[in-house]
């Protein structure tokens, strides 16, 4: 199964990386590697995260450190919708999808 990263999720990852890199480039690289590793894991185990049907039917959420990966598994791919810090409000998650 392949992993598809949506444009909003790409923006999220870019913003996270830029924010962390200002403080610690090494920490930013380490976290981005964790995200990549988790995306590869989702390609093999797409049902790994917790169901978040309260957001969208079929939506799942996986935690990495203090970040939440919101994704939806499909028959042939896993679509990453957003990556948010756990302190961020997720109520507007669908506003730009």
Kindly give the residue locations of the regions a language model identified.
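A beta-hairpin/wing motif
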Residues: 58-61, 69
């Amino acid at each position: 199964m392949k992993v598809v990263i949506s444009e909003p999720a790409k923006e999220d990852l870019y913003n996270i990386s830029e924010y962390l890199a200002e403080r610690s480039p090494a920490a930013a690289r380490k976290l981005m590697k964790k995200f990549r590793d988790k995306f590869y894991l989702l390609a093999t185990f797409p049902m790994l995260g917790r169901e978040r049907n309260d957001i969208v039917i079929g939506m799942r959420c996986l935690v990495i450190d203090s970040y939440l990966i919101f994704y939806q598994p499909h028959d042939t791919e896993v679509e990453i919708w957003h990556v948010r810090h756990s302190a961020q409000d997720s109520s507007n998650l669908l506003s730009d999808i």
